[in-house]
Amino acid sequence: MMSPAQDKLQHQHHNPNSSSSSSSKMTNVYQVTTPKSPQDLENNMDEPFKMDTATSNPDKDSENTQRLKYECAKGEIQNVLNLHIMLNHKHVRHLRRNVQKVNAKLALLETLHKDTGLLNKIERTYQLKIKQHQQHSVLGGHFHDSTATENTNASNYNLSYPVLSDYNINCQPLSSSSNRNLSTTRIPHHHYHTRSKSNGLLLEPSALRPANSNIIDYRLTGSKSLSEAITKPTPVSLPHSNSDGISSPRSSSISPLDEQPGFQILPFKPSQMHLNHRRNYSSTCLTSNSGIIGKTENNEPIFRRYDGILVIITCSKCDRSGFTSAQGIVNHTRLKHSKLYSSQPLAVLNNQKLLPNDKQDPEILSKFKKLNLDPNKDYLPSDIAIPKPQSPINHSENHTRAPKTVKNTPHLEKLYQNKEDFKKLIDMVNETPDDLNEYLKQREIQLRYQKEQEEESSKSDDEASYVPSPSLSATATTTTTTDPPSPPVLSSSLQRKLLRKRKLSLNSSTPMEDLPLRERLRANPTDKKPRKAALLTNELEGPDPAAKSSSYYNLRSKSRLRGSHT
C-alpha cells in the first residue's frame, strides 16, 4: 500500500505535462482565504480521535456488551431461584412442625384415653390448688379463716370449682366407663343467659369456666375470699311451702341455684343491683333498689320492685316472660307492640304478675294496707319504701368532737420573751375551729331568716288584691251588673321580674302602689324590647293614643338626613 503522497509523486513522474498544465491553471485563479469558524476548528481537532475509533474493531465491543448482558441476566435468575427455594423450604418446615404438634396431641389423647382415673387426678390437682390458696391467704393475714378453710373437703370443692364435665356439655371423657353414665352426668346451669345460639367448636373445651352461682354470690356479698363465703353463710328467713302446703320459714345460705331446684330467693342487698354502675350507685335511686333476686319453680326470674314487692315481668299483650330487667320490657313493648312508657317503673307496673302473698314480705304488704294502695296498680311512696340516709351534720359534729392534738412549737416559743403572750396565742389558735363553727352556724341562721323573709314578701305580693278601674256600667241606670275583668295570668318568671322592678323603683319619687296597673306592668323604658306583661295589658286595654314612639333614635327621618347633608 502506498500513501497518497507517493501516488501523487508517481503520477507526476509519469505525466509531467499534466502537472505543468495544472500549475499554469492555478496561476490564473485567485484564491481568497477567510478565517475558519470555531466549528471547523473543533472538527479538525476531533478528526484524529474519530479516525482512531473508526480504525478499531467493532466486533470486540459487541462481544463485551453481550457478555455483560448475559452475566446480569444469569445473576437475576439465580437470585429468583434461590428465593423460591428458601420459601419452599420454610413452608415445608412449617408443615412438618404442624404435623409434629398434631402427632403430639394425638399421643396425648391416646394416653388420656387409656388412663381410667383421669377425673380423679384432675380433682386432686384442684384440691391441691385450693390448699395452696388457703395457705397463701393464711400467710397474708387471714388467720381467722385458717381453721375453717383447712377442713375443706371434696363436697365444698364441688360447690366452688366445676369438674371437667362443666367446661362443655358435649365434652365427655373418652373412656368406656364414662360413656355408660351419660345419663347421670350433671348438665351445668349457667348463671348468665346469653343470646348466642351457635353450636360451633363444641369439641374444643372453653378457656373460661362457666359462672358458678356460688362464686357470684360471694362476690355480691362482698366477702374477701371464697372460704369466707363458704364458712359464713348469710341466713335469710324466707317463706317456703312444705309438702303439706303449710308455709314455714326456711334459712337460705349462699348455694348454687342449679343444685337446689324449686322456688329460690337470694337475700336482697342493694349492692348486688347494677354491678356495672357502681360509680352511680345511690341508695335513694329507684332503679338501684330493684332487680332480679331469684327464680321460680318454672325457672322464671323474680324481679323485686323498689318498694319490695316481688313480681314476674310479663308482657300484658303477648304474655312473654323471662325479662331480667325493667329496660328489657321497655324495649320489648317499644319494638314489638309500639308502646312507649315514660319510665321503667311505669313499664313494670303495667306488665307484671305478682307472686302470692305467702312469698311476699308481710311488712311491705302491711304498708300497702295502711295506705289503702293496691300493689297491682300503685307503688309505695319513695320516702316510705326507701329509707332516707342519715344527715351529714352528725358526721361533722363527731369530727369536731374528736380529741385534738396540740403540736409543740419550740422554735416559735423561743422567739417570744413573754410566755403569757405565747400561751394566749396558742389558746387563740386552738379556739379558732370552735369560733369558725359558731360563725358558720350564725351564717346559716341568717341565710334561713333571709329566705323566710323573701318567701313572706313574695307571698304577700302574690296575695295582693287586684283592683280594676271603675266601669262605665256603674253609672248607667240599668240594673245589670258586670263582673270585674280577671287580671292577666302571668308566669312565675314574669312575676319574679316584676318583683325585682318594684324593689328597684322604691327610691323613685312616686310609690309603685299609687301607680295604675298599666304603669306597674309596663316594662322599664330603658329596655329595648317590650316585656310580655306589657304586651298582655296592651292587648286587654287597647292601644293608648297618647303614647307615641320617640323620634329621637329614628335615624331615617327626613329632618335628620337633611341636617346631616347640610
UniProtKB/Swiss-Prot annotation:
Region (Disordered): 1-65, 231-256, 384-411, 449-566
Keywords for the protein's UniProt record, in alphabetical order: Cytoplasm, Nucleus, Phosphoprotein, Transcription, Transcription regulation
One CC-aspect GO term: cytoplasm
Extent of Basic and acidic residues compositional bias: 449-462, 515-528
Feature: compositional bias, Low complexity: 241-255, 467-496
Phosphoserine modifications at: S282, S505
Bias-annotated ranges (Polar residues): 25-42
Transmembrane spans: none
Localization in the cell: Cytoplasm; Nucleus
Broad class of where this protein is predominantly found: cytoplasm
Gene Ontology biological process: chromatin remodeling; regulation of transcription by RNA polymerase II; replication-born double-strand break repair via sister chromatid exchange
Protein's UniProt keywords contain Cytoplasm: yes
Compositionally biased spans, kind Basic residues: 557-566
Summary of the function given for this chain in its UniProt record: Functions as a component of the transcription regulatory histone acetylation (HAT) complex ADA. ADA preferentially acetylates nucleosomal histones H3 (at 'Lys-14' and 'Lys-18') and H2B. AHC1 is required for the overall structural integrity of the ADA complex.
Complex and partners: Component of the 0.8 MDa ADA complex, which at least consists of ADA2, ADA3, AHC1 and GCN5.
Note: Present with 339 molecules/cell in log phase SD medium.
UniProt protein name: Protein AHC1
Record gene name: AHC1
